[in-house]
Regions:
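Flexible "cap/lid" loop of the alpha/beta hydrolase fold
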Residues: 97-127
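Conserved alpha/beta-hydrolase "acid-adjacent" motif
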Residues: 193-199
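Conserved HGGG/HGGXW glycine-rich cap/lid loop of the alpha/beta-hydrolase fold
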Residues: 16-62
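Acidic beta-to-alpha connecting loop that harbors the catalytic carboxylate
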Residues: 190-192, 214-215
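Conserved alpha/beta-hydrolase catalytic His-Asp/Glu region
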Residues: 130-170
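Short beta-strand/loop motif that positions the catalytic acidic residue
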Residues: 186-188
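Catalytic histidine-centered segment of alpha/beta-hydrolase-like enzymes
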Residues: 214-224
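Gly/Ala-rich beta-loop-alpha elbow adjacent to hydrolase catalytic centers
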Residues: 78-82, 86
Length: 225
């Protein structure tokens, strides 16, 4: 592996994984908080004049902000559970954030009305195995074509790693980890069966939002602008 790109990706460190997929000494950065169970393979964003860093694995929510000290502008994107993770970790970071966009997620990740139903979340933990994960991923993608796209970029993490991440998220959310972080815009998919569309609409009533004809998982390049 190229150490200049992968220096932040160290499995043995108890910290949120932060992985540069593009690091070319640009002055602007796309900081993307991806969803549960994902890793650096989940998405590939290559925007001109921007470096790209992918955040994932919220088993530990500690965040190393010093890696971003040389950037003049940071565009934050959160997808799915990454919306909550970004909200919590960035609220006191004092980074030069230019804009923030939430995609198919909310700041209330485990909540019946504005997030994922707590009963469904618990069942996901209790029943998690290879078969149930496959079912979840198909539901997340919504169509055969989208699923085929997803599996080309799917996570290489173990089932046990994914389960521990869910348990940790559940524990942290129960502590009422509220945030003062402000999102500029929410993007809401009409075919999202993970964070139900109606729940997202309830969660984002007070900010600008865009409704799109997409499933929970999508081609993120279309919405990184």
């Amino acid at each position: 592996r190229n150490k200049s790109i992968n220096i932040l990706y160290q499995e043995f460190i108890k910290i949120m994984k932060q992985y540069f997929t593009k690091q070319e000494n640009n002055k602007s950065l796309i900081l993307f908080f991806t969803g549960w169970g994902m890793d650096q393979n989940t998405l590939s964003i290559n925007k001109k004049d921007f470096d790209t860093c992918i955040c994932f694995d919220y088993t530990d929510i500690d965040f190393e902000k010093s890696h971003y000290k040389n950037y003049q502008a940071i565009d934050v994107y959160g997808w799915s559970m990454g919306v909550w993770a970004a909200s919590y970790t960035l609220q006191n970071c004092n980074l030069p954030i230019r804009k923030s966009v939430a995609i198919n997620g909310t700041i209330f990740p485990i909540e019946k009305e504005r997030g994922i139903d707590p009963i469904i979340f618990q069942k996901t933990i209790d029943l998690l195995n290879e078969q149930s994960l496959l079912k979840f991923n198909k539901r997340m993608c919504g169509s055969k074509e989208n699923f085929q796209f997803f599996i080309k970029h799917s996570s290489l993490r173990s089932i046990e790693s994914l389960k521990q991440e869910l348990i940790s998220i559940q524990s942290m959310v129960k502590k009422d980890m509220t945030s003062t972080f402000q999102w500029d815009k929410a993007i809401i998919g009409t075919r999202d069966f993970i964070f139900p569309t109606k729940n997202q609409l309830k969660a984002w009533r007070k900010i600008k939002y865009e409704i799109i004809d997409e499933a929970h998982f999508l081609d993120f390049n279309k919405y990184v602008d």
